[in-house]
UniProtKB/Swiss-Prot annotation:
The keyword Cell membrane is assigned to this record: yes
Lineage of source species: Eukaryota, Metazoa, Chordata, Craniata, Vertebrata
Function (record text): Regulatory subunit of L-type calcium channels. Regulates the activity of L-type calcium channels that contain CACNA1A as pore-forming subunit. Regulates the activity of L-type calcium channels that contain CACNA1C as pore-forming subunit and increases the presence of the channel complex at the cell membrane. Required for functional expression L-type calcium channels that contain CACNA1D as pore-forming subunit. Regulates the activity of L-type calcium channels that contain CACNA1B as pore-forming subunit.
Composition bias, Polar residues: 54-71
A Gene Ontology term for the protein's cellular component: T-tubule
Residue positions where Phosphoserine is found in the record: S44, S47, S73, S186, S193, S547
The protein's assembly and partners: Regulatory subunit of L-type calcium channels that consist of a pore-forming alpha subunit and auxiliary beta, gamma and delta subunits. Interacts with CACNA1A, CACNA1B, CACNA1C and CACNA1S. Component of a calcium channel complex consisting of a pore-forming alpha subunit (CACNA1S) and the ancillary subunits CACNB1 or CACNB2, CACNG1 and CACNA2D1. Identified in a complex with CACNA1C. Identified in a complex with the L-type calcium channel subunits CACNA1C, CACNA2D1, CACNB1 and one of the gamma subunits (CACNG4, CACNG6, CACNG7, or CACNG8).
Biological source species: Homo sapiens (Human)
Gene that encodes the chain: CACNB1
GO terms assigned for molecular function: calcium channel regulator activity; high voltage-gated calcium channel activity; voltage-gated calcium channel activity
Tissue expression profile of the protein: Detected in heart ventricle (at protein level). Isoform 1 and isoform 3 are expressed in brain, heart, spleen, central nervous system and neuroblastoma cells. Isoform 2 is expressed in skeletal muscle.
A Pfam family of this chain: VGCC_beta4Aa_N
Cell membrane recorded as keyword: yes
Protein name: Voltage-dependent L-type calcium channel subunit beta-1
Coarse class of the protein's main subcellular location: membrane
Family annotation (InterPro entries): CAB1-4_N_A-dom (IPR046937), GK/Ca_channel_bsu (IPR008145), P-loop_NTPase (IPR027417), SH3-like_dom_sf (IPR036028), SH3_domain (IPR001452), VDCC_L_b1su (IPR005443), VDCC_L_bsu (IPR000584)
Length: 598
């Protein structure tokens, strides 16, 4: 019974082995695959695993294969183009050394070149700080100009244009925002950040100061266009129009015209150039307020004088201004003239009082006004002045001034540039103005248009600089609607005879100084007697004497009866025909020879 049951359950004979397929009815299942992954005795893997590894190795080799010939040729072409562009940039840079200065700018921002700035020639970019002065020779492209830093020993290089500086500023601001975002995310778990979030408090920030700071940074352009040569303006020791100040300033002007003969233009400015603020002349709504106010000069007259100063500076000669209305450096701080402020300083108020009293009763009755003006100048920080002349002796003061101006002359006339012929430049400037009467407009605003064009541009040989004013939104050669029509046609350089013949009250716009002419250009009031061209006007003033007292005596001989003119400044050139103001010689004996400070 037992055997029968066992025989019925087992279909195979007892002597036959049981095949392994009975326990694994699906030989292609997951167990067989796992079996294939086992290593053999020699350490190698199964056949299907080995074949897969061969496929993976082949795909990895495809990434590390050598570049194709097309990639190599493309890279070589790029390198060749880069070298060719760099060679052309160097050639253009070399040619620009002998080209005239197209215009000058004063920087409001600093720039330090970095490798990522895409300079046309690496290592030839100009580094500058805020309030530096740059002479621009020409435009290289929309991103770069060619020019030099006005400093002795500096050569021409590439200067970023306002467009380039704005793009660099935007990139820097974007990086700062990203850094702040990353730092704020990483600091979210800090106790201070959590405390701010939970309590809902914010760190106190004065909103008014933040708005003012934002406004000041938004509206400041990178460059201000200034005259190619900074004009020299004398202030102090007191108010202009009074004899003590006029006498001491005249002594310095006489020294300048003899020391820098052929290199300086001295001109008188009667208009109130302190009105030439960018905020006023760029805002038409303020024009009506200025015109309605009881000001000495109209805006049209002020603008005409500014243009004349820019035109004088084009020749790269020194320019000295006898500005009637300028008695304090703050009057010109917001204009684009960027003058060299020379402060004639009298340290002791007692010395100034004695000098004023020595001029007679007509000056003594204005003693308090002059003393107050002197004290106001003395309160200014030294940074507001470029030169402070506090020497006792006239000769020492003159040498101090000459040393500064000689250094400035070397900074503006590098040895690499061809020395220009001022007489030839002035003659050609006359022809250039006649050919194109509309001056190039100012980069910074619509009012400082000097007609600043290279000689090649005036003759049509080189026109690459035509586009540079448009980069800041002002088309070249055009004035805004607020500019009086026909103003540019009145700006012209006159010959010596034209200057003398035009010696009339309305000839300020064309009063130029010619080479070799030691007399400055002055306008004659009809009530003042003979003009510059009159033989009765006398010869040129004598050369600089040894002390301030000697200059005072010369000043007395040349002083005419100007009391009818109020506070207008006395002339530089000697004039006869007018009565000489008397003074008490005994009152001057207390003023020692050459001692005017202590």
């Amino acid at each position: 019974m037992v055997q029968k049951t066992s025989m019925s359950r087992g279909p195979y004979p007892p002597s036959q082995e049981i095949p392994m397929e009975v326990f694994d009815p699906s030989p292609q299942g997951k167990y067989s695959k796992r079996k294939g992954r086992f290593k053999r005795s020699d350490g190698s893997t199964s056949s299907d695993t080995t074949s897969n590894s061969f496929v993976r190795q082949g795909s990895a080799e495809s990434y590390t294969s050598r570049p194709s010939d097309s990639d190599v040729s493309l890279e070589e072409d790029r390198e060749a183009l880069r070298k060719e562009a760099e060679r052309q940039a160097l050639a253009q840079l070399e040619k620009a050394k002998t080209k005239p200065v197209a215009f000058a700018v004063r920087t409001n921002v600093g720039y330090n070149p970095s490798p990522g700035d895409e300079v046309p020639v690496q290592g030839v970019a100009i580094t500058f700080e805020p309030k530096d002065f740059l002479h621009i020779k020409e435009k290289y492209n929309n991103d770069w100009w060619i020019g030099r830093l006005v400093k002795e020993g500096c050569e021409v290089g590439f200067i970023p244009s306002p467009v380039k500086l704005d793009s660099l500023r935007l990139l820097q601001e974007q990086k700062l925002r990203q850094n702040r975002l990353g730092s704020s995310k990483s600091g979210d778990n800090s106790s201070s950040s959590l405390g701010d979030v939970v309590t809902g408090t914010r760190r106190p920030t004065p909103p008014a100061s933040a708005k003012q700071k934002q406004k000041s940074t938004e509206h400041v352009p990178p460059y201000d266009v200034v005259p190619s040569m900074r004009p020299i303006i004398l202030v102090g020791p007191s108010l202009k129009g009074y004899e003590v100040t006029d006498m001491m300033q005249k002594a310095l002007f006489d020294f300048l015209k003899h020391r820098f003969d052929g290199r300086i233009s001295i001109t008188r400015v009667t208009a109130d150039i302190s009105l030439a603020k960018r905020s006023v002349l760029n805002n038409p709504s303020k024009h009506i307020i200025i015109e309605r106010s009881n000001t000495r000069s109209s805006l049209a007259e002020v603008q005409s004088e500014i243009e004349r100063i820019f035109e004088l500076a084009r020749t790269l000669q020194l320019v000295a201004l006898d500005a009637d209305t300028i008695n304090h450096p703050a009057q010109l701080s917001k204009t684009s003239l960027a003058p060299i402020i020379v402060y004639i300083k009298i340290t002791s108020p007692k010395v100034l009082q004695r000098l004023i009293k020595s001029r007679g009763k007509s000056q003594s009755k204005h003693l308090n006004v002059q003393i107050a003006a002197s004290e106001k100048l003395a309160q200014c920080p030294p940074e507001m002045f470029d030169i402070i002349l506090d020497e006792n002796q006239l000769e020492d003061a003159c040498e101090h001034l000459a040393e500064y101006l000689e250094a400035y002359w070397k900074a503006t006339h590098p040895p690499s540039s061809t020395p220009p012929n001022p007489l030839l430049n002035r003659t050609m400037a006359t022809a250039a103005l006649a050919a194109s009467p509309a001056p190039v407009s100012n980069l910074q605003g619509p009012y400082l248009a000097s007609g600043d064009q290279p000689l090649e541009r005036a003759t049509g040989e080189h026109a690459s600089m035509h586009e540079y004013p448009g980069e800041l939104g002002q088309p070249p050669g055009l004035y805004p609607s607020s500019h009086p029509p026909g103003r540019a046609g009145t700006l012209r350089a006159l010959s010596r005879q034209d200057t003398f013949d035009a010696d009339t009250p309305g000839s300020r716009n064309s009063a130029y100084t010619e080479l070799g002419d030691s007399c400055v250009d002055m306008e004659t009031d009809p009530s003042e007697g003979p003009g510059l061209g009159d033989p009765a006007g006398g010869g040129t003033p004598p050369a600089r004497q040894g002390s301030w007292e000697d200059e005072e005596e010369d000043y007395e001989e040349e002083l005419t009866d100007n009391r009818n003119r109020g506070r207008n400044k006395a002339r530089y050139c000697a004039e006869g025909g007018g009565p000489v103001l008397g003074r008490n010689k005994n009152e001057l004996e207390g003023w020692g020879r050459g001692v005017y400070i202590r």
